[in-house]
Design a protein with these regions (language model features):
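Well-ordered alpha-helical scaffold segments within catalytic/enzyme domains
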Residues: 1-9, 47-61, 101-118, 164-181
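Low-complexity, Ser/Thr/Pro/Gly-enriched N-terminal "stalk/linker" regions
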Residues: 1-44, 55-79, 140
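The feature captures the catalytic groove of carbohydrate-active enzymes
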Residues: 21, 28-39, 81-83, 90-100, ...
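Generic structural signal for bulky hydrophobic/aromatic residues embedded
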Residues: 26, 52, 72, 105, ...
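Glycine-rich loops and low-complexity Gly/Arg-rich segments
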Residues: 59, 128-129
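Primarily a tetratricopeptide repeat
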Residues: 64, 121-124, 128
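A short glycine/small-residue-enriched secondary-structure motif
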Residues: 69-87, 99-104
Length: 182
């Protein structure tokens, strides 16, 4: 396991842990971590919060966060854009960047915990998400930003979203190599 990061004179390890504990206090029994009490959650920011929990050594809550994503993943490998605490969908858009990011989070979890069994458990979810993202490419390979709930793709891509997808694909490739997946 990694030591708690800190920046001398700016942010102490205790402050990092306190921040992570405040994030963990928002976590629902389902594993969802809303933006604020009673607020919504999107899978991209949800992965970011799980990564923050891992950095602070709160691996149990981080794993519960990933389990929530396993539980709510759609059959095609995607996730809706925003969820509410009651489990309902607030925004039924499918965003490629949001769906790809779990690969980044699971790779980060591996680097923080070296828990191969958890990686093995999450791999099918990661693989389905990346397969869905790759199905959303233009003929030149550029990943489209999103599609509507009725599966009509938007006709453009975002630089920031595509950059995040590129990073997630690299993390997914590293995960596949780790578990000897072709």
């Amino acid at each position: 396991m990694s030591p708690i990061p800190h920046i001398e004179g700016v942010l102490s390890a205790d402050e990092v842990v306190q921040t992570a504990e405040s994030i963990a206090s928002l976590q629902l029994d389902t594993g969802m971590i809303p933006w604020f009490p009673g607020g919504h959650c999107d899978p991209w920011n949800h992965v970011e919060t799980a990564m923050a929990l891992d950095v602070a050594g709160l691996h149990g809550p981080a794993e519960r966060a990933y389990e929530w994503l396993v539980d709510i993943q759609l059959p095609d490998g995607s996730w809706w854009n925003y969820y509410l605490p009651d489990g309902s969908v607030e925004e039924a858009k499918l965003d490629t960047n949001v769906c790809a990011y779990i690969a980044t989070g699971v790779w980060h979890h591996w680097l923080c915990t070296w828990d191969r069994a958890f990686v093995d458990h999450l791999w099918p979810t990661v693989q389905r998400s990346l397969d869905w993202v790759l199905s959303m490419r233009k003929p030149n390979g550029t990943p489209l930003w999103a599609c509507t709930a009725d599966e009509r793709p938007w006709d453009y891509a975002l630089l920031t979203g595509s950059s995040s997808i590129s990073h997630a694909l690299k993390c997914g490739a590293q995960l596949a190599e780790l578990i000897n997946e072709p």
